[in-house]
Amino acid sequence: MIATSGNKNSERDYVDQAYIRASNLEKVISEYNKKLKSSDLRSIAMSLKSVLSENSFILATSLTEDFGAKGVGEPEKKSILEDEEAHLTELDDTLEAGRLNGLLDRVFSREFTYQTSMLISLEENILTRTKKDNLKSKLTTSISNLEQARDRLDAFEAR
């Protein structure tokens, strides 16, 4: 899930990765939402985008306040950024293939159900590692919101 270069990953590494992942997913939704055919799916996607935006804010605040990061989106381990860029490219390629095959709604709902689950898992990992009460509280709420969004995507996909 996170790049390893022989060094033990720190709590900050996971927060960096979660921030970059949430920000990237938000950008992908912005790009593909207008291409979705289903108004229900567009609504679900915009709701998820809002949750991801709040999530990014929480993680960015934690990076600067709790970890003293000079800038967000600039992880200490460059391999994290490289891995997330590769992950973003793979997601974009999958969605574009779905669009070209006339299956974007189906591919989008499947991929974002999966991507949301991956982000939840990453944030749960942070939650078990952190001793920062403020971050714990905010992540607990964020995870709950992500789970609700994932459940809506899952319900759409099951139709």
Question: Where are the regions a protein language model picked out?
Answer:
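His/Met- and acidic-residue-enriched segments that coordinate or traffic transition-metal cofactors
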Residues: M1-R159
